[in-house]
Structure formats: C-alpha cells, structure tokens
Amino acid sequence: MTIEFDCIVAGISCVDLLIGPLNLDQPLNQEGTWALDTITPTVGGNVSNSSIALARLGSRTAALSLAGADEWGGFLISKLQDEGVNTSRFQQRDGLDTSATAVLMNSKLEHIFAYKPGASEAIDRSLIDDNLDFIAQSKYLLLGYYGLLPNIEPVLHEVLEAVQKTGCKTALDCAGGGGGITPLDKCLPYLDIYIPTEHEAESQTGLRVPQDMIAKFRDCGAAGVVGVKRGEQGILLSPIEGQFLTIAAIKPPSPVVNTTGAGDSFYGGLISGLSRGMDIESAARLGTATASWCVTGMAVSYTHLTLPTNREV
C-alpha cells in the first residue's frame, strides 16, 4: 500500500464563534446589550485544529469527519481545503446540522464553551470502518475526542485494533473533561500515542501525580508512548515503560491571545515530527513549539503558523 498521508485526523469538527470579552462572573442577563471586541467565525474541533497545524508544518494531511449539508458545513470544509488538507472523505450529510461552538471569552483570555453537538453526535464506528482503505494510506490516525463520542466509545477498542491492523499507527485526543477510565482501559493496548492533559488524566485515573497517572495507564495495557500535558510545566512523556522524559514548555513568540486549540496543535506538531523521522523527544519539542505558536492568534486557523527551525525547537 502506497503511503499518501503523514496523518489523517478523524472525529469532531465544528464551526467556532469566538465571542468576547464577556464578564464570565456576571450573569449575562444583567446587561441588556454587551459591547464586544469580536464575534469571529472560525473552525474548531480536533479535526480542524490538528489538521491545520499538521498541514502548516508541511505534513501530508487528510480530514475524516461529518458535517451537515448546510452553509456552516461548506464553510468548514472550504477552510480546511484552503489550508491544503485533503477532504475527499469528509462527509456532508442531509438532515444533520453542522456542529457549532460559542467560545465565550473574558478579558483575561479564559473561556467557556457553549456547544451544539449536531453532526458530530452522529459519528459512529462506520466513520472509521468504512474508510479503512483510506486510513491504510496514512502513517498515523489521530482520533478525537475521547469523552465526546458516545456512539463509538463502547467499541472504540475494536476500531483502534482494526486501524492498527492496516499498518497505520493510532493516537487519541481527549476533551469534555477527559471521561473515565472505562472504556479507555480497553483502548490503551491499541494506542501508539496517548497524551491527555493533567486534568483529563486525573479525571480518568483518580490520581494527582503525573508519574502515577502514567503508571495507571501502563497497568491498563498501554504499550505505546504515554504522557501528560501539564500546561506551562511542559509535558511528562513515557516513551516506554519505566522511562520518563520532561519536555519543557516553549515561550510563545508573541503575546498570548487565545489558548483554544493548543492541545490539538501539540498533537499536530508531535505527529508531524514523528512522521518525518524525529526521535520522540525532538518531536515532542516540535509539538510544544507548535502549541506556543497556536496561542498567539484568535484560533489555529488565524495564527500565522510556520515551521519552527531546529534552533527554535
């Protein structure tokens, strides 16, 4: 099988409306009208964020997702195409509304989400099973979000196993607080990469120490690269059982504007590095550099992301 892609990003895609600034500590109905700096439409979800980061880093990238046959769906797909992302298997389906998120931000750049699941809620195992021929043409499949895919999570371990049998490596992204250890425990043996945030890992394991969280994932059968994203404290990685690497966070090249999509961008940078033959430490540093670029714009698609040089990484 000819390898056509470095990574296919599958799962949730949505249109994001970036709205702010708002006083998130004050009930919205206390003001009749809010004067805002921005109401900006862009694209979000792991499929949009990670695939755009990958494409801008020069990786051959495809998106595998589901949207409605509506204007927002057309907007979403056209944005990805403009970034050079292959959307040949990105479905628009009649009778569904494209998923959308209102990202409500305050003046300190903190945010909360108001999310309409829409088409993403209809994602089931057929999204992967019906496209295994396509996935077999890729080095990696990055799937997300665990915690927000109720129709696929009960059989997710079977889906990941089927992907690995094609020769494609697997990675899983999280959201929605991270979900629980079940059914993640069944999935970990079929993941080549799994790096949740510290908050997500705590929710999943009930533990507070990152090394203990990773040990819990290993106890569940994780054999690939496991780690914990720790924000400004960087990344704790375990490439193999018993080995730990601390990857420092990289200072953003300009002031932070919005942190939405930083975790997805980290995954994009990491997989971009691995697909071009970097060792895990160098690839993870590319991931942290990519995340640091992401936060300097209103969203991944609005950030002028260019490939960091070896010196910058």
Regions found by a protein language model. Name each.
Residues 2, 132-136, 188:
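A short, aliphatic-rich alpha-helical micro-motif
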